[in-house]
């Protein structure tokens, strides 16, 4: 873990970005490779999906949609205990996200002028669920339940197949609990292309959400405009603000819970107490050796772990706001008092019993969060990502007559005479 002492004047945003090195590096070579995959699927459809799945996943698929038989086979492999946990998690996620639902509205703003907004679910969305180092049934729930709460009538999910040509049973069990019925065994950039462009057997979607590897991130970036996307997700990150009142064993465990995701996952400890920070560092080294994903955690901690030694709480949260972390834990006495100091964080966990994994699985708020500093301008996935709104405007004759001349003056000032003409012809009524 690299130690950084924050000077009295603090660091600038540019300095913090340099120190933390959280840029999502999507190279030109990667762009070329992904562009070729997208073009192949767009032009080749189902045949291209089969060819690319064989090439990248080593699996030959005649039909890449999950069948009811495969779903039932998967459910038979899942323990009843895990199925109940999935159901409880789904209920918590659903309850939380129902609070985000917006209702359409109209209001009489002036005599004869009715204005409003109409909120409508996106009619068809695609959800990408990653495979790779681990299977994430939690991501299935987090990314599909808000879409269903929003009222999206069509949700298509895709995820990479295993070497046996099947989807991980836990992934399918989560989809079953969520209520998703359209599931495909297609991963990587080709999965994104399938959702964006459609094939002979797959209807295209209007928006794609969900995290993935660099190929998936690049594919989402390149199809944006053809479809909407939620975000470009980078490696996971956690930031913990803590002092000597916290337990270094607990803090170390929380930091490692994110380090195990990816060799490029970042962990940040921000503290005014150097002795406490050193205890956390020692604990991280000890605990890593006892956990199964040691090599991944070791790479993350060696390359992307930073400890910022600050002068006081105000300086701690100044650094937090410049990092704009995906996950932020605050383990200081009376942690709620610091909320007004926090501007930039994807998810905020207050107090020593609010360990970050609660948010990953069971609490209810979404765990698909902005990474790489993007929490400074973006938000967690939610119902609002699956809804669009249209403005609604209605004038009666009297209201039109009051405003018509002013619109004509405005239009002519911009040189748009046809706009003015559209008003003039109604003046004669």
Regions found by a protein language model. Give the residues of each.
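Alpha-helix C-terminal capping segments
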Residues: 142-153, 176-178, 196-202, 220-222, ...
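A glycine- and small/hydrophobic-rich beta-loop-beta segment
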Residues: 257, 261, 269-341, 345
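N-terminal Rossmann-like NAD(P)+-binding subdomain of aldehyde/semialdehyde dehydrogenases
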Residues: 1-123
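Short acidic-hydrophobic, aromatic-tinged amphipathic segments that line or gate anion-handling sites
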Residues: 2-9, 182-187, 307-312
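C-terminal core of ALDH-fold dehydrogenases
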Residues: 322-429
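Conserved NAD(P)+-binding/catalytic subdomain of aldehyde/semialdehyde dehydrogenases
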Residues: 179-257, 261-266
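Conserved small-residue-rich beta-alpha loop and adjacent elements
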Residues: 107-173
């Amino acid at each position: 873990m690299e130690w950084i002492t924050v000077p009295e004047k603090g660091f600038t945003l540019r300095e913090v970005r340099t120190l933390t090195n959280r840029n999502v590096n999507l190279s030109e070579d990667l762009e070329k490779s992904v562009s070729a995959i997208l073009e192949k699927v767009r032009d080749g459809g189902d045949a291209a999906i089969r060819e690319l799945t064989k090439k990248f996943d080593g699996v030959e698929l005649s039909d890449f949609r999950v069948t009811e038989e495969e779903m039932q086979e998967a459910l038979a492999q899942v323990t009843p205990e895990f199925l109940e946990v999935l159901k409880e998690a789904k209920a918590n996620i659903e309850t939380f996200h129902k609070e985000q639902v917006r209702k359409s509205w109209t209001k009489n703003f002036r005599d004869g002028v009715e204005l409003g907004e109409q909120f409508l679910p996106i009619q068809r969305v695609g959800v990408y669920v990653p495979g790779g180092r681990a299977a994430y049934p939690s991501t299935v729930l987090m990314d599909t339940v808000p879409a269903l709460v929003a009222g999206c009538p069509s949700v298509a999910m895709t995820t990479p197949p295993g070497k046996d040509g099947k989807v991980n049973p836990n992934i399918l069990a989560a989809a079953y609990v969520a209520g998703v019925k359209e599931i495909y065994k297609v991963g990587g950039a080709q999965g994104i292309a399938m959702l964006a462009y459609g094939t002979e057997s797959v209807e295209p979607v209007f928006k794609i959400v969900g995290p993935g590897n660099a190929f998936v991130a690049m594919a989402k970036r390149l199809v944006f405009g053809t479809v909407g996307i939620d975000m470009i997700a980078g490696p996971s990150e956690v930031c913990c603000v803590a002092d000597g009142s916290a337990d270094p064993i607990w803090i170390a465990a929380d930091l490692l819970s994110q380090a195990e995701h990816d060799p490029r996952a970042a962990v940040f400890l921000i503290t005014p107490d150097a002795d406490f920070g050193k205890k956390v560092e020692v604990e991280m080294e000890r605990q890593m050796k006892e956990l199964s994903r040691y090599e991944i955690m070791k790479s993350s901690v060696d390359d992307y772990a930073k400890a910022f030694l600050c002068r006081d709480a105000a300086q701690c949260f100044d650094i937090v706001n410049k990092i704009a972390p995906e996950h932020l834990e605050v383990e200081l006495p009376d942690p709620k008092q610091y909320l007004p100091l926090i501007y930039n964080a994807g998810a905020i966990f207050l107090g020593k019993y609010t360990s970050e994994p609660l948010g990953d699985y069971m609490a209810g708020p979404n765990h698909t969060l902005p990474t790489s500093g993007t929490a400074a301008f973006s938000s967690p996935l939610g119902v609002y990502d699956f809804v669009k709104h249209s403005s609604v405007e209605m004038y009666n004759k009297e209201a039109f007559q009051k405003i018509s001349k002013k619109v004509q003056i405005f239009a002519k000032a911009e040189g748009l005479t046809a706009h003015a003409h559209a008003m003039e012809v109604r003046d004669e009524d």
